[in-house]
Every structure is written in structure tokens, then in C-alpha cells.
Amino acid sequence: MSIDTLLYTSLAVGAVYLASVALYELYWSPLAHIPGPKLAACTRLYEFFYDVVCGGQYTFKIADLHKQYGPIIRISPREIHIHDPNYYETLYATNSPRNKDPWFTAHFGVDESAFSTLDYRLHRSRRAMIAPFFAKARMDGAQPLIKANLAKLIRHLDAHASSQSVLKVEVAYNSFTGDVITGYTSYRSFEYLETTDMVPIWSETVRNLVESGMLSRHLPGFFPLLAWAGSRCIAAVYPKLLPVIAFRMKCAQEVNFMWTNSEEGKKEAIQSGCSEPALFPELVSRASSAPDITEERLLHEFITIVAAGTETTAHTMTVCTFHIAHNQSILDKLREELDNRFHSNADMDLQTLEQLPYLTGIIYEGLRLSYGLSHRLQRISPIDPLKYKDIAIPPNTPVGMSSALMHHDESIFPQSHEFIPERWTDPNDRRRLNKYMVSFSKGSRQCIGMNLAFAELYLGIATLFRRYDMKLHDTTLDDVQLHGDKMLPRAKNGSKGVRVTLRRAQSVG
């Protein structure tokens, strides 16, 4: 057989194969009855184009597709997306089994964490080990740690106020939340607030970690190849990966220290003044009687919890900061509420702050416009078929919904792109709207650190805006609005972030 004949035969076989795949997906697949673009039904390249080539634009394309095809659409050969706010609690159910999609979780390199656990039964047991450490009842005990880190943050902000230098708030807030989550779960914080510059690279590390996972699911051999080629190749081809590698190494060192120095951990607990055991030292102490607790498992949990507990809360604080600094009326109402309740910042306590309606409105509106994960979160019903209206969805089909679409549904949140704390201040309105506010997701896989995040937000926003007047510096709404979805929300290309100058407020601080 000649080379030409072999080539033509190969092309013909390839064409027949691709045509067969397309025909199957369009006409015989169990999902063929779901409306949506034909190309998306045939190949993941449709998603690849919008998410990788266009830079995190598939969420916006999905929103357009819903306008064209309706509330349920097929967005890939094996995935469904639904946009119907009233269906959210059905999909993200508390008492129905829900698996995760490996397409979403498998490329972060933390397979043994509760976050990445696919099977609902194994997830239940893994989550049960962790959840008590983040219970609402434990948040009173977290206040001293949060306030201590706020005091460190304030020293940095006072220096900026004195020098009138420009502060990039994402850097400050990520250092604050990073030190809180590491101190809370392991007694040993990363101490970013102890440095002179608050480690600017840290504010991008978690974003790079998540973004690289999103890219690697489309190009599964790309990052292993880079790792094999070495750091010089990584620096030349994808430098965003370097701080991610450094972060994983730092996490591995911390977990190894806890794993091999359990007695030292007890001493640090006493020195830190903690009245209750921290998550990771406590899990280490149980390892001898729990064979499923391994150093590798703890590393995966540590990476996940630190990453999740840093960027999302810091981003919510950043969104709140922009809108408070941008709107004097919001700042005045917040200050009045705080001044009427507290004589000084030292008097503030979490339980009282949670009762303040306007502060609560600011925090909920900040959560709504920061989205948590802006990307869709797929759930799989492993046993029973799901049903959306009269459309049956076969078992083991990934089905996703998106906070970025939920939070901008005008039928639920009129003027959804506006920052309006008043929409949350009435308790009845808050109860009604909270059903549709999904920054922490809902159901059996809801964000485990939600209570700690709320504690940081209440204490952080109240303390900082009672103490400082912040003036935006070369910052616009485009620097906080959602322009790209790379798992985490991204501002416009070229954004320098939210930057402010500060001065001490005239009121009590």
C-alpha cells in the first residue's frame, strides 16, 4: 500500500468516525432530546473555544444560549445546564445523593479532599470529619484570632494612611484571610501580615491555581509535560504555574510538620490561646485509629481549605470596599449604624454585628456580586433520574447551575448589577432572597467554611470602615464587575485591581 493510499484511507476512517460520533450525539445519545447548539452536543471544542481561546467567556455564552433555547440546555456531549432559580434547591439537594463530575474536580490535584470527592457516600464521611470545626457554635472562639489578624492588617493600613501611598486592597485582604484560615485550622498561620509588603504574589496564587486546573481539564497532558520539562520551561511557557508550585510545596511542608510533630502542635495550641482543638492537629491525633487519615489526604484537604478560605472571602471584601468607597451614602449609613451601637471598635462582637441590618445588607450584597465560584457547579444524581418540568435527565448526567446567572436574574434581583444593601435589610425580604443567593452553593456539598467567612466579613468590614475613609484611586466599576469566568470571577483584562488611598476617619476607631 502506497503512502498516499494509507493517508487517504486514514482520513476516510477518521471522517467516518467523526461523522458517527456526531450522528450518535445528535440523534441517539440519551441527551439528544435536550435543546442546545449542535456543535456543543458533538464536541468539547465548543466549550474550549469560549473558555480557553476567548478567556473565560463560556458562562456568558451559556446565558445567551438560555435566551435562545430556554431554561434547560445541553452545553457539551455529556453535560446539561439549567437556569431556573426555583430549581436550584432540587439540584443541590441536602437529602438526595449527589456525586461530583470528574471533569470539574480531577485536574486540581487534590483528589482525596472532601471538595474533590466524587462519590456521595465517601464525601459524606470525609465531610463529617471536617464540618464540626466550622460550625456556627465555634465562631465565637474564632473571634480573637480574627481580631488579632485585623490588628496586624490595621498596622499596614495605618502606614499607608500616614504616607498617603496607594493600597491594592486585594493584596491586603488576601493576606488577612490567608492568615486567618491557616491560623484557624493549624495554629500556625502563613504570617503574610508579618511581612512588609503583605506578599503581593499571594493574591494571585489561588487564582492561578484554579485557572490552571480549568485549563488542564481541556489539555490534560499539558501541565505534566511542563513539570517534566522543568522550571525554566514553566517560566517560559506558563509562568503563572510557578507560584502555584511554590504554594503546594509550602502546604506540603506545613502538613509534614504537623504530621511529624504532633506534640509541638499541642504546645502551639496552648501558646495561641485556642480554647478548642484546630482541625489539622486534631486529625493528626486521630490518624492512629483512623486508617483513612493519611498525610496525603491531609495535604489535599489543607490545599483545598486554604485556597477556598482565602480568595473568595477576600474578593467579597474587595467588592464591598469598592462600593462603600464609591458611594458616600452607603458609608454614611454604615457609620451611623455602627456609631449608634458601639463606642469603639474594641467593643465590637460578632453576635451584635450580625444583628445590624445595614451592615448585613452590605455583606449580602457583596456576596451576591462576588459570586463565590462564578463557574457552574455540576451535580450528578447517581441513582434516580432528575426531572426538569417534563424533561427527563438520565442518572449519572452532570447538571450544572451558575451563581453568576442566578444573581443577575432580574425577576429575583431587580437592578441586579447595582449594589443595593437595602434589598436585604428587611428580615422578611432577606429570608425570601436568601433562597436565591448561592455564593456558598447549597445542599450536602455547600461550602464548609461559610460561617468563618461570615465572621471575617462582619468583623472586617465593620472595623475597617469605622476606622478609615477610603478614596478610590484610578479604579472603576470594571475593576470589580464580572468580565471573565475562570472558575473565580475575573475583572476586565488589564485591570490593576481595586486601589485606594486612606485616611483615618474622624469618628471613633
Curated annotation (Swiss-Prot):
Pathway: Mycotoxin biosynthesis. The keyword Ribonucleoprotein does not apply. PANTHER family: CYTOCHROME P450 (PTHR24305), N-ACETYLTRYPTOPHAN 6-HYDROXYLASE IVOC-RELATED (PTHR24305:SF157). InterPro entries: Cyt_P450, Cyt_P450_CS, Cyt_P450_E_grp-I, Cyt_P450_sf, Cytochrome_P450_monoxygenase. Signal peptide: none annotated. The gene is otaC. Its EC number is 1.14.14.-. Keywords: Glycoprotein, Heme, Iron, Membrane, Metal-binding, Monooxygenase, Oxidoreductase, Transmembrane, Transmembrane helix. Glycans are attached at N327, N493. It is a single-pass membrane protein. It comes from Aspergillus niger (strain ATCC MYA-4892 / CBS 513.88 / FGSC A1513). This is Cytochrome P450 monooxygenase otaC. The chain crosses the membrane at residues 7-29. Pfam families: p450 (PF00067). Belongs to the cytochrome P450 family. One of its GO terms (molecular function) is heme binding. Heme binds at C447. Cytochrome P450 monooxygenase; part of the gene cluster that mediates the biosynthesis of ochratoxin A (OTA), a mycotoxin composed of a chlorinated type I polyketide dihydroisocoumarin moiety linked to L-phenylalanine, and demonstrated to have nephrotoxic, immunotoxic, genotoxic, neurotoxic, and teratogenic properties. OtaC catalyzes the oxidation of 7-methylmellein (7-MM) into 7-carboxymellein. Gene3D superfamilies: Cytochrome P450.
